[in-house]
Design a protein with these regions (language model features):
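Conserved small/polar residues in nucleotide/adenosyl-binding loops
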Residues: 2-10, 189-194
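Ligand/cofactor-recognition surfaces for anionic moieties
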Residues: 13
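Hydrophobic, Leu/Ile/Phe/Ala-enriched alpha-helical segments that form helix-helix packing faces
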Residues: 17-20, 78-86, 150, 170-174
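A conserved beta-strand-loop-helix scaffold within acyl/acetyltransferase catalytic domains
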Residues: 20-39, 153-191
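Conserved donor-binding loop and adjoining core beta-sheet/short helix segment
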Residues: 26-97
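Short acidic (Asp/Glu) patches
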Residues: 74-76, 104-109
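Short, glycine/charge-rich beta-strand/loop segments that flank catalytic centers
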Residues: 88-105, 116-120
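Acyltransferase donor/substrate-recognition loop-hinge adjacent to the catalytic core
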Residues: 107-180
């Protein structure tokens, strides 16, 4: 039941993400890593399934990642942990496919709630790469303004040397955009017992 810190385990986490491809930002190492301090995210491997726990919000877990039999075993372990510790069992990052699978395993036992505020924006690669068309005009303007304001910008791979700077940049962005004042920032799509 030991929970590990996310950083330094990218290879392991990416291995599990590759087993269950998803378009969710919650299923990318960069996103999990950058938000791991804010939400106190820890991970564990339970029954050969990857599980994330948001320690800042009680016992809330991301839907496990792995092969179906491993996911079911991990879910049962998580439910047991919550029962032993006397807390409500809740999941986030539950896709319609995940919920269908749970309905198969546990008919009528769970309900799902959609939280629009936590939905991902999904763009087609080509449209985002070219930013062509009227719909993406605003994004083109933002990028052009950024390039004017920061002519020395560059891309960098995440490394030991720049990891703290990345966290500080993300925290600075959150502070300047009022995210710390928003009580809803820890809200997710939850799956709970009815």
């Amino acid at each position: 039941r030991g929970l590990g810190d996310v950083y330094k385990r990218q290879e392991l986490i990416d291995y599990y993400f590759a087993q269950a491809p998803s378009r969710s930002c919650e299923r990318t190492f960069a996103n999990v890593y950058l938000w791991s301090r804010q939400y106190k995210v820890k991970y564990a491997i339970l029954h050969n399934a990857l599980v994330f726990r948001d320690e800042g919000d009680g016992h809330t877990y991301a839907y496990p990642v792995g092969k179906p039999e491993a996911v079911k075993a991990a879910l049962e372990e998580l439910m047991k942990i919550c029962e032993e510790e006397g807390c409500e069992f809740g999941l986030y990052c539950v896709t319609p496919e995940n919920f269908s699978q749970m309905e198969e395993w546990y008919p009528g036992q769970f309900q799902i709630e959609y939280d629009r505020d936590q939905a991902d924006y999904i763009y087609e690669t080509e449209k985002l790469a070219t930013l062509a068309g009227k719909k993406l005009h605003g994004k083109r303007n933002h990028i052009n303004k950024f390039k004017q304001l920061y002519p020395e910008w560059s891309y960098e791979s995440l490394s030991d040397e720049n990891v703290e700077a990345c966290f500080q940049m993300a925290l600075k962005w959150r502070n300047s955009n009022g995210c710390n004042d928003d009580p809803e920032t820890v809200s997710y799509t939850h799956l709970t017992l009815p």
